[in-house]
């Protein structure tokens, strides 16, 4: 038995610990880590595992079951630990990335883009209202209005947005109006309130368009616009002041017109836009998200400065009559164009400046392409013909090279500068006086006298008369015309200039030449702006241009008397001038006819049958008050429709009417008969 006991003991050592003092339940050796107890869920799982029938994989070989189980537990614990560490690190990385993104965005918001965002935020609150300045008026010398402004509205609409809103409202409730019917109702309302201008069809077409913004109508009375918008809130109203031209086409070539946004487009409306338009005012304030103005936020108040009134030298009555006469002359003569200018003989002020076929600025200018939109009197130079002979007449008298009664033996042609120049009619040698040379408008006699003057003095006289240079009248688009510099003259140049060929001038320049003779030899450059009147009523007169002495007073008086010969009548014809139809009974009238061949652009040569027909005259020769210049572009007949090619009848009509209008007394002395041809 003593041998058997030790053997059992050795066998038991392999399966349980050696005998010794038993530890109480829950006791732990010093230095030994306490293993965490299993949770209830873990114990339940373990019991469930034990209760399951053993499978092949659960059955471990004898002696290895405990070690394998422990090995699997260690592996499972390691795997679960590695997975936890991975998830933990991944989560930290994601959080770090999000923090970096947030920090970057915060940097951009608070540092990099801070100023712009602050401005944008302020802009969403800030509102600036513009207070339009009233455009100044344009009036004549008597303060009769040619152009003025009244307050008006433009009806606006946003087709795409409004239609979308109407369709969405219709989808939500059947009580909402049918979108297409609503548009038709709006079109009918607008057309009805505006007297069918535009008509309903035109309005509906705009309402149904694919545009984002359209104007339904312009120049609408504010009360009418308010009524339409109140009934149909979909329609907006925008302030667009209406420019009124009470005379229609009266002086439209001078006054001009404006475009749809109220700025100058043509004429003085364009060139004086800064003076007439004024400066808009404005006020800035803040508005909350509900659209209500934030109290106390008003700032940056700038009061509107209204435009100034421009006072012209024109006389509406004279302008109206001359414009009528010009249109009538065009119709009767068959001319392509007709223009006329009336100047005050003493001051050079423009009293009338008229063209035919003038546009109406109160209507849509864009639809008046067949009308005369420009101002040919200042912008379209032409060769004047014999009207230019006043230069030779003035020079020869001023330099004492001839006298009015000197008799010249004038042949039918003359050789000069390598060219042969003829008179307009065939004749042999004629005993014309110097007065008769100009009264009969002899080209040959004029060149004979011009040879006495010489090129240098003749050129100097051209410049004194203001040719080849702008007048500075104050109108846009003015042409200087053309006078060849003397150093570019060829041999034939001096054979052409004295008879009005080879140079060009505007109608205003031509009329200004005769103003110098009417004003005792002093040329006052013409002007059309008399004064400006500020909104506060203060008036600023336009400075009078400097006077230019052209010839002496005595020379001017002599030339005026010589030019009476042009309108002189003689039943026999010997002492009759070229423009007797210009005369006005009871008054001494003086003037000069002109005919000039037009240039054929195809060959650079002159047409044989296309002419400029001109006339310039003084009313009256003994007491000058008015200077009148007229131009007809290639007429088929006289300005009164009679056979011939003369503008003298138009001068007669205008001058005679002026004498009656102003109650000018008859000339006390009709003047002695002038000798044109010696007998």
Swiss-Prot record:
The residue range of the signal peptide is none
User: What is the recorded membrane topology of this protein?
Assistant: Single-pass membrane protein
Query: A Gene Ontology biological process annotation?
Result: regulation of cell shape
InterPro entries, from UniProt? Bact_Transpept/Beta-Lactamase, Beta-lactam/transpept-like, PBP_dimer, PBP_dimer_sf, PCN-bd_Tpept
Annotated active site residues, numbered on this chain, are: 386 (acyl-ester intermediate)
Q: How is it modified after translation?
A: Cleaved by Rip1 in response to oxidative stress (H(2)O(2)), prevented by Wag31. Cleavage probably occurs near residues 102-103.
Q: A Gene Ontology molecular-function term?
A: penicillin binding
Tell me a GO cellular component.
plasma membrane
Chain positions covered by the region annotation Disordered: 1-74
Stretches of the chain found on the membrane's Cytoplasmic side: 1-90
Which Pfam families does the protein's record reference?
PBP_dimer, Transpeptidase
Quaternary structure, from the entry = Interacts with Wag31.
The entry's function note states: Synthesis of cross-linked peptidoglycan from the lipid intermediates.
Give the record's family classification: Belongs to the transpeptidase family.
- Entry text on domains: The enzyme has an N-terminal penicillin insensitive transglycosylase domain (formation of linear glycan strands) and a C-terminal penicillin-sensitive transpeptidase domain (cross-linking of the peptide subunits).
The name under which this protein is listed is Penicillin-binding protein PbpB
Q: Which organism is it from?
A: Mycobacterium tuberculosis (strain ATCC 25618 / H37Rv)
Gene encoding this chain?
A: pbpB
């Amino acid at each position: 038995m003593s041998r058997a006991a030790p053997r059992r003991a050795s066998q038991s050592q392999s399966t349980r610990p050696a005998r010794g003092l038993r530890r109480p339940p829950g006791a732990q050796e010093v230095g030994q880590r306490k293993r965490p107890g299993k949770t209830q869920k873990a114990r339940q799982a373990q019991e469930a595992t034990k209760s399951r029938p053993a499978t092949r994989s659960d059955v471990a070989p004898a002696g290895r079951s405990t070690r394998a189980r422990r090995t699997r537990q260690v592996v499972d614990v390691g795997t679960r630990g590695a997975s936890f560490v991975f998830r933990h690190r991944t989560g930290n990385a994601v959080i770090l990335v999000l923090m970096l993104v947030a920090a970057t965005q915060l940097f951009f918001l608070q540092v990099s883009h801070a100023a712009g965002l602050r401005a944008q935020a302020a802009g969403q609150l800030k509102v600036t209202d513009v207070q339009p300045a009233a455009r100044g008026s344009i009036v004549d010398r008597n303060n009769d209005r040619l152009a003025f402004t009244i307050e008006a509205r433009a009806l606006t609409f946003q087709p795409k947005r409004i239609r979308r809103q109407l369709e969405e409202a219709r989808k939500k409730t059947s009580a909402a109006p049918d979108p297409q019917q609503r548009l038709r109702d709006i079109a009918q309302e607008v057309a009805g309130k505006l007297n069918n201008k535009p008509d309903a069809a035109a309005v509906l077409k705009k309402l149904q368009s694919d545009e984002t913004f359209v104007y339904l109508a312009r120049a609408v009375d504010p009360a009418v616009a308010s009524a339409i918008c109140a009934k149909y809130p979909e329609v907006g109203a925008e302030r667009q002041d209406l420019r009124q031209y009470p005379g229609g086409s009266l002086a439209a070539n001078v006054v001009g017109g404006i475009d749809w946004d109220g700025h100058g487009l043509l004429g003085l409306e364009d060139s004086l836009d800064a003076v007439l338009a004024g400066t808009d005012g404005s006020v800035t304030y803040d508005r909350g998200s509900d659209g209500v103005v934030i109290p106390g936020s008003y700032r940056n108040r700038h009061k509107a400065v209204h435009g100034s009134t421009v006072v012209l030298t024109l006389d509406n009555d004279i302008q109206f009559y001359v414009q009528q006469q010009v249109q009538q002359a065009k119709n009767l003569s068959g001319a392509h164009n007709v223009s006329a200018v009336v100047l005050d003989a003493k001051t050079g002020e423009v009293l009338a400046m008229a063209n035919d076929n003038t546009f109406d600025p109160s209507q849509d200018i864009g639809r008046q392409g067949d009308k005369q939109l420009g101002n040919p009197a200042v912008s379209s130079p032409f060769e004047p013909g014999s009207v230019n002979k006043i230069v030779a007449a003035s020079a020869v008298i001023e330099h004492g090279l001839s006298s009015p009664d000197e008799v010249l033996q004038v042949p039918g042609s003359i050789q000069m500068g390598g060219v042969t120049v003829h008179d307009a009619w065939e004749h042999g040698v004629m005993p014309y006086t110097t007065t008769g040379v100009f009264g009969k408008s002899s080209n040959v006699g004029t060149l004979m006298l011009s040879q006495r003057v010489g090129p240098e003095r003749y050129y100097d006289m051209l410049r004194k008369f203001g040719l080849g240079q702008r007048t500075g009248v104050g109108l846009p688009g003015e042409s200087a015309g053309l006078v060849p510099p003397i150093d570019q003259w060829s041999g034939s140049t001096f054979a052409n200039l004295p008879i009005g060929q080879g140079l060009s001038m505007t109608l205003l320049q031509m009329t200004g030449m005769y103003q110098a003779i009417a004003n005792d030899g002093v040329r006052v450059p013409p002007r059309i702006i008399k004064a400006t009147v500020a909104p506060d009523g203060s008036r600023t007169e336009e400075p009078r241009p400097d006077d230019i002495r052209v010839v002496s007073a005595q020379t001017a008086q002599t030339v005026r008397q010589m030019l009476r010969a042009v309108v002189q009548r003689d039943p026999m014809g010997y002492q009759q001038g070229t423009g007797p139809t210009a005369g006005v009974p009871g008054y001494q009238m003086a003037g000069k006819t002109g005919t000039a061949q037009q240039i054929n652009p195809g060959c650079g040569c002159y047409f044989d049958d296309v002419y400029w027909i001109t006339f310039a005259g003084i009313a009256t020769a003994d007491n000058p008050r008015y200077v009148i210049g007229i131009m007809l572009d290639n007429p088929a007949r006289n300005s009164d429709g009679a056979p011939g090619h003369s503008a003298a009848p138009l001068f007669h009509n205008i001058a005679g009417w002026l004498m009656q209008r102003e109650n000018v007394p008859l000339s006390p002395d009709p003047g002695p008969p002038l000798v044109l041809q010696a007998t």
